């Protein structure tokens, strides 16, 4: 443990970070030993407060708009100086971490936080290398000062908080944000911009490896099942959220997991349950007087979270990477009950559904989305985190799928037998059965039937899954109502896809009216 005269705590151990957080009243310990914290009125990401500095080296490569908002370079310099001075006047914490597990693609990051618990969070989620920055690369700086209050009129921000990326200066400024997920997603966005230049596809996905070395990717928005389904006791976890796919390799961008905790149970999610122990952080989880976590209590938020290092997962890839994927799974939470539990996709269909990113917003992962559930299209299954034009990522995906011969599947973790409020959601064991069949190779070359309106091919049988569930129309009591719902969903797909300039073959791979 080192402490400089200016009260900078540098590269503390996990034990010491927990101790400092407790001494400062930043959180309390749960009965499992995990540190429990609350993040105030922001319990999810704030997309309207995220900016990218407009500067010559990147301005022509970024898809500017409501997601990637421009921020003036001079305003950034002034605000960084102001926040840094505020932070330097008090005790703070510094850790040196990597973002990206592949030797050729890591970023060396100096992470400075005002709070001990956010530094612990960063140590959970980022990579703690045996040797820091062995290649001697230029260092990125993350400055995360939770108690600084931005003044929009003075600082050029949207509110009292901000997340600003500066590629030219290799800086990420996070001010006024207690929700720690902002730090993780900011560095993901950085890698999402940088990796394509090295012919690496960055992906919002989970990944795991079977005993035979076969790799599966799970794409999907928050709440669709990436973390839960990839945490499989029969397989080795690479990671639950952020990966890069290059020639010959899938590598984790992170060194930990950030699991949604709502309704978490030891029975359905044993890997996650066991990982929540000393060194982990529980964010906005309610605990009782006995310090026992109540994962069913959503009084703080539906977006309660657990952050833990991969070392807390018994079966994991020791190198934090694997080979190229045999199976690529797009997870979608379909509110309408129209999509089947599993469809087998062609290359063109893979591109179509990757660009569409159809799913539901489940819970309040983003501030302002409310606690309910609504359908959405999120390009690349993670639109908020991809700075380049979507077509660049889609082209890289097709290149990688074609080059390795990966099989691609669309898996619905949402509703069956009717839409939200009428039907019911697929239970986790059913979806795990679908995943197991995919990973066993049972669906390769399987006999299928074609569903015309949604233009998908559905296997006639899936080992371990009830056959009556496979064609969604058969699960509806009112077949005419299903047909109408299918047409309505097809219309949403078609309308959303108008913004993409792609080949006719890809356009033809989507739903039809």
Curated annotation (Swiss-Prot):
Catalytic reaction annotation: oxaloacetate + ATP = phosphoenolpyruvate + ADP + CO2
Broadest EC class assigned to this enzyme: lyase
Chain sites annotated for binding ATP: 185, 204, 220-228, 269, 305, 431
Binding site for Mn(2+): 185, 204, 241
Keywords: ATP-binding, Cytoplasm, Decarboxylase, Gluconeogenesis, Lyase, Manganese, Metal-binding, Nucleotide-binding
Any one biological process term the GO annotation gives: gluconeogenesis
GO CC terms of this entry: cytosol
Binding site for substrate: 45, 179, 185, 305
One family name in Pfam for this protein: PEPCK_ATP
UniProt cofactor note: Binds 1 Mn(2+) ion per subunit.
Molecular function GO terms recorded: ATP binding; metal ion binding; phosphoenolpyruvate carboxykinase (ATP) activity
Location, primary (coarse class): cytoplasm
EC number: 4.1.1.49
UniProt-listed PROSITE patterns: PEPCK_ATP
Family: Belongs to the phosphoenolpyruvate carboxykinase (ATP) family.
Annotated PANTHER family: PHOSPHOENOLPYRUVATE CARBOXYKINASE (ATP), PHOSPHOENOLPYRUVATE CARBOXYKINASE ATP
Purpose: Involved in the gluconeogenesis. Catalyzes the conversion of oxaloacetate (OAA) to phosphoenolpyruvate (PEP) through direct phosphoryl transfer between the nucleoside triphosphate and OAA.
Subunit structure as annotated in this protein's UniProt entry: Monomer.
The name this protein goes by in its record: Phosphoenolpyruvate carboxykinase (ATP)
Gene source species: Pseudomonas fluorescens (strain SBW25)
């Amino acid at each position: 443990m080192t402490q400089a005269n200016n009260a900078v705590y540098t590269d503390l151990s996990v034990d010491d970070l927990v101790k400092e957080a407790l001494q400062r009243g930043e959180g309390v310990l749960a009965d499992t030993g995990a540190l429990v914290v609350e993040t105030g009125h922001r319990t999810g990401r704030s997309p309207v407060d995220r900016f990218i500095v407009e500067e010559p080296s990147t301005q022509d490569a970024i898809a500017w708009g409501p997601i990637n908002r421009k921020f003036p370079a001079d305003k950034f310099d002034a605000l960084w100086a102001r926040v840094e001075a505020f932070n330097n006047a008090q005790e703070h914490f510094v850790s040196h971490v990597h973002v990206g597990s592949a030797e050729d693609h890591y970023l060396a990051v100096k992470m400075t936080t005002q709070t001990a618990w956010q530094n612990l969070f960063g140590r959970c989620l980022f990579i703690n290398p045996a040797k820091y920055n062995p290649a001697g690369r230029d260092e990125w700086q993350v400055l995360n000062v939770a108690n600084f209050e931005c003044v929009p009129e003075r600082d050029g921000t949207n509110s009292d908080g901000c997340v600003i990326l500066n590629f030219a200066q290799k800086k990420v400024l996070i001010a006024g944000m207690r929700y720690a997920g902002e730090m993780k997603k900011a560095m993901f966005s950085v890698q999402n911009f940088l990796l394509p230049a090295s012919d690496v596809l960055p992906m919002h996905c989970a990944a795991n490896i079977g005993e035979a070395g076969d790799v599966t990717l799970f794409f999907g928005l928050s709440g669709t099942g990436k973390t839960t389904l990839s945490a499989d006791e029969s397989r080795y976890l690479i990671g639950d959220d952020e990966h890069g796919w290059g020639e010959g390799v899938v590598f984790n961008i992170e060194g930990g997991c950030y699991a949604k905790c709502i309704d978490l149970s030891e029975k359905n999610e044993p890997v996650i349950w066991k990982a929540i122990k000393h060194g982990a952080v529980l964010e906005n989880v309610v605990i009782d007087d006995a310090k026992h976590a109540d994962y069913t209590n959503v009084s703080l938020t539906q977006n309660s979270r657990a952050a833990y290092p991969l070392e807390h997962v018994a079966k994991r890839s020791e190198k934090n990477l694997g080979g190229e994927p045999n199976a690529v799974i797009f997870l979608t939470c379909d509110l309408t009950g129209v999509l089947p539990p599993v469809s087998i996709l062609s290359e063109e269909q893979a591109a179509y559904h990757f660009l569409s990113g159809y799913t539901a917003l489940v819970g309040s992962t983003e501030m302002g989305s409310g606690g309910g559930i609504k359908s959405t299209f999120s390009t690349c299954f993670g639109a908020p985190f991809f700075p380049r034009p979507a077509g660049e990522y889609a082209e890289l995906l097709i290149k990688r799928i074609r080059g390795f011969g990966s099989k691609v599947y669309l898996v619905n973790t949402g509703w069956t037998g009717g839409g939200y409020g009428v039907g019911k959601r697929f239970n986790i064991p059913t979806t795990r059965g679908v995943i197991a069949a995919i990973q066993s190779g049972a669906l390769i070359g399987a006999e299928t039937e074609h569903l015309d309106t949604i233009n998908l091919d559905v296997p006639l049988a899936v080992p371990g899954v009830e056959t009556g569930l496979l064609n969604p129309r058969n699960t509806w009591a009112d077949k005419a109502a299903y047909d109408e719902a299918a047409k309505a969903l097809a219309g949403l797909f078609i309308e959303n896809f108008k913004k993409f300039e792609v080949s006719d073959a890809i356009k033809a791979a989507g739903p039809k009216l």
